[in-house]
Curated annotation (Swiss-Prot):
UniProt-annotated location(s): Cytoplasm
GO MF term set: GTPase activator activity; guanyl-nucleotide exchange factor activity
Domain of life of the native organism: Eukaryota
Residue list for modification Phosphoserine: 40, 281
Coiled-coil blocks: none
UniProt biased composition (Low complexity): 72-89
Keyword Cytoplasm annotated: yes
The protein's name: Rho guanine nucleotide exchange factor 10-like protein
Listed Acidic residues bias regions: 26-46
Function: Acts as a guanine nucleotide exchange factor (GEF) for RHOA, RHOB and RHOC.
Biased composition (Pro residues): 1-10
Gene name linked to the record: ARHGEF10L
SMART domains: RhoGEF
Lineage: Eukaryota, Metazoa, Chordata, Craniata, Vertebrata
Key word Cytoplasm present: yes
Amino acid sequence: MASSNPPPQPAIGDQLVPGVPGPSSEAEDDPGEAFEFDDSDDEEDTSAALGVPSLAPERDTDPPLIHLDSIPVTDPDPAAAPPGTGVPAWVSNGDAADAAFSGARHSSWKRKSSRRIDRFTFPALEEDVIYDDVPCESPDAHQPGAERNLLYEDAHRAGAPRQAEDLGWSSSEFESYSEDSGEEAKPEVEVEPAKHRVSFQPKLSPDLTRLKERYARTKRDILALRVGGRDMQELKHKYDCKMTQLMKAAKSGTKDGLEKTRMAVMRKVSFLHRKDVLGDSEEEDMGLLEVSVSDIKPPAPELGPMPEGLSPQQVVRRHILGSIVQSEGSYVESLKRILQDYRNPLMEMEPKALSARKCQVVFFRVKEILHCHSMFQIALSSRVAEWDSTEKIGDLFVASFSKSMVLDVYSDYVNNFTSAMSIIKKACLTKPAFLEFLKRRQVCSPDRVTLYGLMVKPIQRFPQFILLLQDMLKNTPRGHPDRLSLQLALTELETLAEKLNEQKRLADQVAEIQQLTKSVSDRSSLNKLLTSGQRQLLLCETLTETVYGDRGQLIKSKERRVFLLNDMLVCANINFKPANHRGQLEISSLVPLGPKYVVKWNTALPQVQVVEVGQDGGTYDKDNVLIQHSGAKKASASGQAQNKVYLGPPRLFQELQDLQKDLAVVEQITLLISTLHGTYQNLNMTVAQDWCLALQRLMRVKEEEIHSANKCRLRLLLPGKPDKSGRPISFMVVFITPNPLSKISWVNRLHLAKIGLREENQPGWLCPDEDKKSKAPFWCPILACCIPAFSSRALSLQLGALVHSPVNCPLLGFSAVSTSLPQGYLWVGGGQEGAGGQVEIFSLNRPSPRTVKSFPLAAPVLCMEYIPELEEEAESRDESPTVADPSATVHPTICLGLQDGSILLYSSVDTGTQCLVSCRSPGLQPVLCLRHSPFHLLAGLQDGTLAAYPRTSGGVLWDLESPPVCLTVGPGPVRTLLSLEDAVWASCGPRVTVLEATTLQPQQSFEAHQDEAVSVTHMVKAGSGVWMAFSSGTSIRLFHTETLEHLQEINIATRTTFLLPGQKHLCVTSLLICQGLLWVGTDQGVIVLLPVPRLEGIPKITGKGMVSLNGHCGPVAFLAVATSILAPDILRSDQEEAEGPRAEEDKPDGQAHEPMPDSHVGRELTRKKGILLQYRLRSTAHLPGPLLSMREPAPADGAALEHSEEDGSIYEMADDPDIWVRSRPCARDAHRKEICSVAIISGGQGYRNFGSALGSSGRQAPCGETDSTLLIWQVPLML
């Protein structure tokens, strides 16, 4: 691969030695390139350690230093270079990466000596010159001039003889050096070396001894020249410095680096850099090649004049395209500003305000991101030029951002962002020149955006693209040639954003565990647990620990870092020194000498209990436990002094009880006053009633205070050491969370982490990778319980269907909402052939489901459908709460389809199980499936008929008494129905018929499977696609909802091979899509989980998925979802409630609160949910020094610009017009987020743990192998 750089020239400012002739023609035939090192203020002088005072070039008559005797042989790759180009037959990607992405300045020089001239010629040196006399091994005199500066040269030409002296240059010359000598300080980001470094050996190798001898000989030659003057002294000093760097590189280099050094000298490749520069090893492994972008700017993308006669959607699409062009142009300019205004000046600055090594860390991968978007901008320019004729943009996004290189460079940048901000923050305090440089650049910038504001833009680029493509897709009509490509582009960007989120989470998890491990002694048991590799960080946050006195007064509070691991809870102090008397942090605290954290306590997770205010009695045994509050001096017996010790909110609870007692006394006084015969001042019924009303108002205020205090107060009961008598002592620790959302997250994760420690969840899921050791991610569903489906086991009833009826229970406490299953009731239907059917109703308003009602039916239940309340009726009811005719109100209902053709409607509000209305299907055909749409209740029958019951007004939603509208779909049974926005899909055999939603007129049909004997059994929709399962075969297929095109096919058997070895015949029996996960149930009882996109793009599967180790002994009869929405008022903190409408008025334009979503569950389930890239920047907020911000702070007294408060959310960039404002910081946005509690229920015969098949001990099944069983998985709250 030829170098794109021009031939190296002497740098400006360097001068040749007076009286020394220039390079001759023969010297130019030997273009030996120098090896480069970046200048750094962290370099140390190691020449004394080596005993080498100075070094100068040698004469050409001396024997060569390097002998090529052990060159590694590499198999040639004919694809690496086309024939006839003169490029070597094989190329090292790692070398190319080093050459292309090195952060140091590139410079080189040529030897200016000649064998015909018998005098010494001193070369023109630049600062970065290291190797000054590297001979070119076997130069090709006939090589054309275009190939002289090749980055790589053939070490062994094909068919060329190998001489004896060319067969060896062993790396043993450098094995006598250690990394410890002269090594500079460790970088901010710890990068593990690729290989172990060699040990220190003081004995020099023969080649280095020969090097020292030649060094002394050459020095004598220099002195003999008698060329004095200032220029000669400067050149000698530069030469000595560069040779010092060379010797230091030889001493501190790893074996891997020395091998590359040897190859570099042999090939004359200028890629050698210090091993500790961040990014070298990563770039070698990635194999990224630098894209040469011409300095000549291509024409900027610009839309031409708008043609006449455009439709409104075309006009909007042009405006959105203009926003894409403007946003991309601004983004590319921001990336260029980072390099031109900050990185390049910092690298060239003398003296350096920031070392080259730190510059590499701060600006890591910015150049590569710029290359990606420069190419995208060029393609965008050509697409904009032909917009009026094509109107296509989606395929450009797919082609540009589906490459793995884009994911790699953005992953490196995002994972390095926190470290870069840490370096900048520390440098602002330790180096005034650097802070002055940042201020000066900000003042000179046209928009006065800080470096932080520029560097945060790559993090939020893909959320901006997603928003723009969503708007473009909304304004692209069906049938447009750009619609499918836009949906595919939206899927690519969403998948890319999800991968970046997951990689960022894993990187933060590893970094936090490493920091925690450093704070623990090497001999402690906690250190062994943390370093075992079995610990997974579930949640980590900075909370405020509070300590109260005997009367409930706040004694002290301090910030703690709390770590929730998969099996333990750790609390640590943040190890930063306090401020001085001026209120400023000491400079010595910026670089901590010790660990970042100091562990205060840690405890096993099963022993941690969450205690809510007013619910202490049911949490622990007060008679056998002593309560010692954290920070208290003495432990007080809970049964004796607990009534006198009030802990914050419990004090409010006690005051509420006192008010209730006072109100009872005042009511008695009121009764006594009413018996008075005389009239007395201030002692009459009016005053007594005022007393009662005042006490009632105080009670309401106290209840609100308790409720508000409980929202952000996390009370944990921790085990302590027993006292002298052996009685256990428990410690109460109180943490204040930043917002109610944070507390919900802690309570939920603590609860699920405890469940995850059960035997059936160790492990609960397996990723079928090659090593079979991949850990399931933290968001993985956890098996919460396994219960019998029917209370009566006398008859072996078969499962038919299950639905969830959501009902909000106001009696549940704050933590109960976070830990319990989705509120509501489970309706489970089934039966037995010839023995009738049965319906079982379970209540989910408790930690474990319990049966509340069971009733028999005349025939087995084959299908069920939950029909929520209509949206418009719910809105009218919310506007006018008083209804004249309560019987006219339509409540949510449960519709049942039986084997004898009966269709029954039950009210889901109460559990009285009174049948509202019933009817019989045409011909008494068994009802195989039920679906509701805004216009009809649809029933698929056994004979291929589709029965549609229209909507009515009144207390019953559907007119089941009148004859239904019947439509023949096909000769076979209608097995499944799917209701879309404007269409209904009905399957019959291998074909699917698409019906118009209102008139049910057939629009078109297509063949989903080529085998006529196969039937479509399940259809689920996600985004713009429909996944289908079939009656036989191991595959599921994806079809487009608009073009009906077959997009993807997935073989489920490949995911279950290691669980069921030798099982060839596998069939999919159930499908479910929920929260970006596709659940697949099989006839062998195995459940497979596949990730799918959540947005309105194409829901294609890109990941490998997971397989559950918990399943059924028989086929998975159904998969159902239970979902409930947490009430929005639960998420409002007391401060937000106190602000009220005043806070809305105080917000600037564009930052007002969004309208509060309606809390009705039925409508929330149908509402589309979007995701965005959610990189959290909170990990830099705890660092000392000025906080970073992209905003221009308000100048105080004409002072220079300072850094203001750091933004808490990456989307809050309202000062920049090119940034799309999507949401606000976490603390203020908490009460507007929808918190969904989700559980997945599978039904089948018995319970089976597949862990025994992998060699682990199988768990004893709670039910028989033939009993109908429900498995309930609880999904972590999506916060």
